[in-house]
Amino acid sequence: MEAIQEKTTAGITTGNFQIIVFKQGEEEYALHIDQIKEVVITPTITRMPQTPSFVRGVANIRGNIIAIVDLEEMFGLKRTIPMAIGTNHLGKNFTLVVQSEDLKMGILVNEVPNTLSVSQKDFDESVNIINDSRVNSNYIRGIIKANQRLIILIDIFKVIDHEMLQSIKKTA
């Protein structure tokens, strides 16, 4: 018999859930595994004119042209890896391809992201203290406590507001 799982207000089911963990700046962030289509080595990125600075450009991933977004730039975080000489992707070697019904885009990351199984008891969804005029304030789904670390679980599609979404759609 299948166990019935209740959804919390953040959309996370009770019990265990899977996340993809990656670093941006000095902090660890995570996305729910359902938001990730694949992880690829960052391809050549073609810069597009008149796009926000956090949109690094577009790339061809498996025949699809998608916008590539730099969360360090978007969040105003201190860069952990400087621009690599002879490249256009800031030394960020991997791209998380995320997809929703409305949008498909890539998120630049420095290292191979890790998959982590999280118990509901290690997830605190009451954290909604960020108020940033550049992004939707509801993008933080909660904080995960894992082995003396705090990991910020974000909803990538809430990070992108309507104006940003239109800009990204025009890019790709």
Task: Give each language-model segment a name.
Residues 1-172:
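An acidic, low-aromatic, low-complexity terminal/linker signal
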